[in-house]
Amino acid sequence: MKILVTGAFNCINEQLKAIESLGNQVIFMQNESDVLPCDYTWIEGVICNGLFLYHDIKKFTNLKFIQLTSAGFDRVPMDEVERLGIKIFNARGVYSIPMAEFALTGVLSLYKGFKFFCENQAQKSWVKNRNLIELFNQTVCVVGAGNVGTECAKRFKAMGCKVIGVDLYPRVDEDFEIIYPLDKLDFALSNADVVVLTLPLTEQTRGLFNKHRFAVMKDGGVFVNISRGAVVDEVALSSALSSGKLYGACLDVFDKEPLGSDSPLWDYQNVIITPHNSFVGNNNNERLFKLILENLKGI
């Protein structure tokens, strides 16, 4: 197969050679927005992230295989992929561990006042905080019980939490006390001290967390979003923070990125903002490479 690999896969020469050793021809392109280094019709497979934001998928007339370096499919014209019968794979499980660790760290940072202490350290100020909270025995609702959600559940369970889930496809899973269907979301939220979003962005989930969802959450809850920014109505979130409805929030993703300097979310003392960074981990490349080889061998 003739494969275009983009810089979205931060590969080394040995990895490209391993892909070629499976009988493939490989051509590399660093920036996905650049002019292609070959004719569209030459390409039978691509390893990419946002390539089709810049290049019309209809021009790839011989395309049979897409390997995404992202967990989400929202940067790909899935209607065309399905119509053309192209096999597509996401980076399933590649980023689950660092994202789950990030979610746990965010909640602990809020409960243990790390932002307060770090700011005092910068001022060389020795001030105690008597209002810290234990994570032990809290109920955590993970919305989206896929690979990332399951890794989150494992870690919160290990901290002594009761973990419940919400998913389009509920199932019995040892890492969750129960996984509710999506139509039970409000009930699950009303029983949770911590809510962690790990669900994908689809037309069904876009704007899912609106004014109503924040209203049904328990008073004093913690909200974590490591999924996609467009799942959340940021005006409703800001209102829930300013009213004191939420104890705090850890936000790694936003509707528009970078987050604008005029966003009120920057100004809350009880909000941790990170620049879509939760997926980063030192073992990602190794996991992604292994997954790519498995998928190539399987087609």
Label every PLM stretch briefly.
Residues 86-139:
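Phosphate-binding beta-alpha-beta segment of Rossmann-like dinucleotide-binding domains, i.e.
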Residues 47-48, 68, 196-197, 225, ...:
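Redox-cofactor binding/interface segments in oxidoreductases and associated redox assembly factors
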Residues 2, 25, 139, 161-162:
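Residues at the starts of beta-strands that form the adenosine-phosphate
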Residues 159-175:
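NAD(P)-binding Rossmann-fold cofactor-contacting core
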Residues 170-264:
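Rossmann-like adenosine-cofactor binding region
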Residues 7, 92, 136-157:
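Glycine-rich adenosine-cofactor-binding loop
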Residues 1-87, 210:
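An N-terminal-biased, well-structured beta-alpha scaffold segment characteristic
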Residues 87-102, 116, 256-299:
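C-terminal helix-to-coil terminal segments
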